[in-house]
């Protein structure tokens, strides 16, 4: 039973169910998905007992942002200090975690955290991501001042990951509220964002990639590093707009002072061959329109009178 529930097919199904359930109940001025990242200075605040979680880690895959974590049990002094720290940001993503199922206990929302959310909505552009029961919105003041509100229904790792992707347009918004939140949102509320504008992150099985092949990539990278071919690298594989492999190996330099991270940002120079010329040549070769045994000047006649006239396409 355990193996069946945790098989690749079962996980893919669960991911699809979660993805289709995520509900954007409010989106003032169309802030979500975030478009002009160059105009946004984003902070991500997790009201959580954890120092860092998958939600924030996934957000960081899309842009540079500052992460803050504070437990719901923190006192007003700490929450107010955090509000002061957030003044320099023009967009604040607040994710609410570790909720419970008890209405009598306000679904685990502490008075301090509720006060914090209200005060923050008065001062900042707030995007709220509620990882729990939508009825909890009844206890949250200031929703009318928030830019966007996403209801995610539970706090699982998959839900956290996909919620972050939705905010940046990695996946569309399709869900609708199954219940009404008194005086705030009616049953069936749910803004539809049918188009994805950025890469989606998922598991290899979603694109039918074979894990044993991906393990070979790991081995090649690690072997190259051990042989001194390069100090480190990041390898990312995408199919149909879905990232199914994204790993970092080794260090940036041979002195091993800084590890390579999947969150590192690189200069995008010298990628034309990889992302343009090579795929185009592969397509033409597959259509029998390019003979790689011929000379380049057979296709680019202006090279015929240069010192490049003997270069073979291959």
Annotated model-derived regions:
Residues 225-259, 292:
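A short, well-structured edge-of-sheet supersecondary motif
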Residues 1-206, 210:
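Preference for extracellular/luminal or secreted protein segments
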Residues 1-4, 251-253, 295-302:
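Short linear capping/connector segments at secondary-structure termini
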Residues 267-271, 284-314:
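Active-site helix/loop module of the DD-peptidase/beta-lactamase fold
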Residues 262-265:
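Short alpha-helical transmembrane interface motifs in multi-pass membrane proteins
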Residues 162, 274-280:
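Short amphipathic alpha-helical face segments that pack within enzyme cores
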Residues 218, 222, 281-282, 297:
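Solvent-exposed, non-membrane alpha-helical residues enriched in polar/charged side chains
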Residues 206-226:
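Short, basic/aromatic recognition patches
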């Amino acid at each position: 039973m355990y193996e069946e529930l945790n098989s690749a097919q079962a996980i893919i199904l669960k991911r699809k169910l979660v993805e289709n359930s995520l509900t954007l109940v409010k989106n003032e001025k169309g802030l979500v998905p975030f478009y002009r990242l160059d105009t946004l200075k984003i902070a991500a605040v997790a009201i959580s007992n954890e120092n860092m979680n998958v939600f924030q880690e996934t957000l960081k895959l899309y842009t540079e942002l500052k992460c803050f974590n504070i437990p719901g049990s923190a006192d007003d002094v700490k929450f107010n200090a955090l509000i002061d720290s957030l003044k320099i940001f023009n967009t604040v993503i607040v994710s609410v975690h570790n909720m419970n199922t008890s209405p009598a206990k306000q679904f685990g929302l502490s008075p301090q955290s509720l006060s914090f959310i209200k005060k923050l909505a008065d001062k900042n552009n707030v995007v709220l991501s509620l990882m729990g029961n939508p009825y909890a919105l009844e206890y949250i003041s200031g929703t009318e001042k928030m830019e966007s509100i996403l209801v995610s229904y539970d706090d699982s790792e998959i839900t956290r990951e996909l919620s972050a992707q939705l905010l940046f347009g990695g996946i569309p918004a399709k869900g609708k509220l199954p219940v009404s939140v008194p005086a705030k949102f009616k049953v069936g509320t749910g803004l539809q964002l049918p188009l994805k504008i950025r890469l989606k992150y998922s598991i290899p099985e979603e694109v039918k990639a074979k894990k044993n092949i991906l393990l070979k990539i790991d081995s090649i990278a690690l072997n190259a590093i051990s042989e001194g071919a390069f100090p480190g690298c990041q390898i990312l594989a995408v199919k149909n707009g879905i990232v199914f492999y994204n790993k970092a190996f080794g260090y940036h330099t041979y002195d091993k002072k800084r590890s390579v991270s999947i969150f590192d940002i690189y200069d995008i120079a010298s990628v034309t061959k990889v992302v343009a010329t090579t795929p185009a040549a592969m397509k033409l070769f597959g259509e029998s329109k390019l003979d790689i045994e011929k000379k380049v000047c057979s296709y680019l006649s202006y090279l015929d009178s240069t010192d490049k006239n003997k270069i073979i396409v291959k």
